[in-house]
Every structure is written in C-alpha cells, then in structure tokens.
C-alpha cells in the first residue's frame, strides 16, 4: 500500500511541483497510522512511504517504527529524492526500514538543476 505522508518537497521538479506550490499535510501521522492499521487488518503487509519528500515530515522515523509494531507488517520501503539520506540513514536503519528508492533525475549537475530547480546533485549522491 502506498502512503503519501506529505505533499511538501525541498525540490521543485518540473514534472512534479510548480515553483510556488508547497501544500501542508492534510492528515496527521496518527491518522495515517489508523488507515495503515485498518489496511493491515484487510491483509496488507507491505507499505511504501512516499510524498512529496517524506524525509521532511517531522516524526517520520518514529512513524516507520510504529508501523512495524503492527504484527502483520513485513516490509516498509521509502521513496525519497535522497537529499536528506545522510541526515536520516542511521535512524531509518534503526526504525527497521526494508529498502530505499531514490529518485535520481540525472547524473549531470546542470541537467539535475534544470529538472529539480535545486543545485543538490552532490548532496543526493552523498546520501
């Protein structure tokens, strides 16, 4: 089950988000947890955490730990732009995250900047 925990993002990719748009979350992590709990009771065992950029959501690593407290949950993956991975990698491992998908738009700095609106390829690669 795909769970979008935020619409906010630190990038402004041409294919995803206009320059001025940065919508606040509409559901709390507690509310999202209740949805995940209900889904698990219907047989869902795998969750994919997405956004926007899920790593800018306060409390995301605790939320992942909490999802793993649901007995039937077997696998949690996160999709990220990679910018904050260095900052959160250890916490994500401790939370039990199964895997990480990184959206990498280009390995060329100028093209990366043009697509994402952010000069952050080095930060993403470090992550």
Model-found features: residue ranges?
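Conserved alpha-helical substructure of the radical SAM core
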Residues: 1-76
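Conserved AdoMet/S-adenosylmethionine-binding subsite of the radical SAM
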Residues: 58-127
């Amino acid at each position: 089950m795909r769970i979008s925990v935020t619409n906010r993002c630190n990038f402004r990719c041409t294919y995803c988000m206009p320059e001025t748009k940065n919508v606040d979350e509409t559901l709390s992590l507690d509310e999202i947890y209740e949805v995940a709990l209900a889904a698990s009771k219907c047989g869902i065992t795998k969750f994919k955490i997405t956004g926007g950029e899920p790593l800018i959501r306060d409390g995301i690593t605790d939320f992942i730990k909490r999802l793993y407290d649901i007995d039937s949950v077997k696998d949690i993956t996160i999709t990220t732009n990679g910018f904050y991975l260095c900052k959160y990698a250890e916490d994500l491992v401790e939370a039990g995250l199964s895997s990480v998908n990184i959206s990498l738009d280009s390995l060329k700095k100028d093209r990366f900047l043009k697509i994402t609106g952010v000069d952050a390829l080095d930060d993403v690669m470090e992550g």
